[in-house]
Amino acid sequence: EQRLNYARYVYFDKNGFIRVFSLLDKLGTFLNELLEIRTERIKSHFSYFTVLRTMRERGVHPELTVPLNKLKEGCKESTHRLRRRRNTEIHYMNSEMHDDLLQQTRMYGQEVLLENLDQQLQDLATGLHMAVQSIRLTFQYAERMLHRH
């Protein structure tokens, strides 16, 4: 039963953090088009974070940029860990392979550190909160833009 629970955790955790970044990437594309940021001129493949940084550097739409940036900064540590996990998962190896490799290469008798599941769940919850609140702020701003025109 413990293995089954862990297998479920791994499936839903991976699915969760990949989907959080998928939401953010789609939001970045939406913001880029809505606000005519043209991030693709700087970087052909860009993320939400690239669009937000470009908005901040250009000083455009401060009534949206400031709260989005504040939200991002408030979730910085968790988001950084999620990004590192996502990049490891996509570009190198998944966390189970990483754990297996560490266990095989450690010296006998040393304490083996495994994934911190509680931390990972908290990071995922924080990342989801940031994504949902960023979407909310963006759509509220878009609605105000539509009413002005």
Regions found by a protein language model. Give the residues of each.
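Charged alpha-helical initiation segments
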Residues: 1-10
